[in-house]
């Protein structure tokens, strides 16, 4: 077996043939012989190898297909998905069918674990990666992280006791708040009426209401803090901690180091002046339900923590940019939503001048968080998308500040 080493000299291709047995370990030669024997193999020069190896490409396809399936569960049509991912409708259908097969074993587990609750046999329908609708009245959610499970249970219980609109926990036959097997933890809650909004940019009243709803949740959270201990977190500490470590480990692949340090410096100057309290931490349209234009309930407190209050506001607005293809939101419409959303929030709960001034910095820091997180997940496409959102906010800092400053006068 030979390996071909090829290089160019004055336009001519010079080929050096070398016996693989003289270069490679016997075990490696035997491994290669399982794929090819008696033929020449070209091994490219290392620095000319494409950045994306076949393995990385396959990982990208896996991530893409997972995203497609998740969005289909969220109600995005096959034709919309085909346009978003530049695939044919038949390809989208094939991907969804394949992904659904992968969840069949989990569906069977759900049907079994439901016996832990004293409810009638119901149809099981997957509605999210980790959530199943049970009949018309319940939602079952799965967890691998018991801390995340207990955090959600704690907050749901406190909010329900205060009359806040959340899906109440249904106790098991043994009067426990959750069930478990060898792999997962399960929590069953009453299903709230309503659904998430998909056309938020077409209704400024709903946008304003969304701001009010978040403000009311923050007020309730503030009152809840005295009833128990909650996870303390800090966006600034994350920036100086694991986020920076990921960027250093990856040689600042997407992020300019000086831009990162400059953002941290600006954030540090104002951070101690920003109010800290219990926040939702995952504010997006899927977690706030509306029924015929009226707010009907909050869901999913898995990530709730004590952090800067404006994190939730910034996170929500950034989420609209990350879903712009689904929601069909232009930059101009996003700025309009920003105005009504902050105006609605401040009708219920005033923001400090320092909070408003920090909004662009917090938005940019959140996107750096997502770039780092997606890099750790080997999700290159989402990491690049997060970087684009950061660049959009950084480019439009003055516009963001101007709109927020004027929102109270709107």
Language model regions located:
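ATP-binding pocket architecture of kinase catalytic cores
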Residues: 135-225
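A cross-family kinase active-site recognition segment
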Residues: 201-254, 276
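Active-site acidic catalytic loop and adjacent metal/ATP-binding pocket
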Residues: 128-136, 140, 169, 265-311
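Short alpha-helical "recognition helix" segments of helix-turn-helix
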Residues: 77-86
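Short, small-residue-biased leader/transition segments that mark boundaries at the very start
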Residues: 1-3
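Active-site activation/catalytic loop segments of kinase-like enzymes and analogous catalytic loops
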Residues: 310-349, 364-381
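Short, amphipathic alpha-helical "recognition" segments used to contact nucleic acids or chromatin
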Residues: 59-76
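ATP/Mg2+ or Mg2+-diphosphate-binding catalytic cores
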Residues: 370-410
């Amino acid at each position: 077996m030979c390996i071909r080493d090829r290089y160019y000299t004055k336009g001519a291709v010079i080929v050096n043939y070398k016996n693989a047995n003289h270069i490679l370990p016997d075990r490696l030669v035997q491994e290669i012989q399982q794929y090819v024997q008696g033929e020449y193999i070209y091994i490219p020069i290392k620095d000319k190898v494409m950045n994306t190896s076949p393995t990385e490409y396959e990982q990208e396809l896996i991530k893409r297909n997972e995203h497609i399936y998740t969005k289909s569960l969220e109600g995005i049509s096959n034709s919309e998905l085909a346009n978003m991912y530049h695939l044919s409708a038949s390809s989208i259908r094939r991907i969804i069918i394949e992904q659904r097969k992968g969840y069949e074993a989990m569906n069977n587990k759900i049907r079994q674990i439901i016996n832990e609750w004293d409810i009638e046999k119901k149809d099981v329908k997957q509605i999210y990666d980790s959530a199943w609708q049970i009949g018309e009245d319940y939602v079952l959610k799965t967890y691998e992280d018991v801390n995340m499970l207990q955090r959600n249970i704690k907050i749901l219980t406190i909010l329900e006791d205060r009359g806040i609109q959340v899906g109440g926990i249904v106790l098991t036959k043994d009067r426990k708040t959750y069930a478990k097997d060898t792999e997962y933890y399960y929590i069953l809650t009453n299903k709230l009426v309503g659904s998430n909004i998909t056309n938020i940019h077409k209704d400024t009243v709903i946008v304003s209401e969304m701001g009010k709803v978040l403000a009311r949740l923050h007020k309730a959270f503030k009152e809840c803090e005295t009833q128990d201990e909650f996870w303390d977190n800090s966006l600034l500490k994350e920036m100086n901690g694991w986020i920076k470590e990921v960027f250093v480990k990856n040689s600042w692949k997407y992020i300019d180091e000086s831009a990162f340090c400059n953002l941290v410096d600006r954030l540090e100057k104002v951070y101690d002046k920003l109010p800290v309290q219990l926040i939702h931490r995952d504010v997006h349209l899927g977690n706030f339900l509306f029924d015929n234009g009226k707010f009907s309930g909050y869901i999913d407190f898995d990530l709730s923590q004590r952090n800067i209050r404006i994190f939730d506001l910034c996170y929500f607005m950034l989420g609209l940019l990350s879903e712009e293809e689904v929601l069909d939101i232009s930059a101009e419409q996003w700025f309009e939503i920003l105005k009504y959303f902050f105006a609605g929030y401040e009708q219920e709960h005033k923001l400090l001048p320092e909070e408003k001034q920090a909004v662009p910095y917090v938005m940019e820091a959140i996107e750096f968080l997502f770039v780092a997180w997606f890099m750790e997940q080997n999700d290159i496409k989402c990491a690049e998308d997060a970087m684009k959102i950061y660049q959009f906010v950084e480019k439009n800092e003055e516009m963001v500040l101007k709109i927020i400053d004027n929102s109270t006068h709107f």
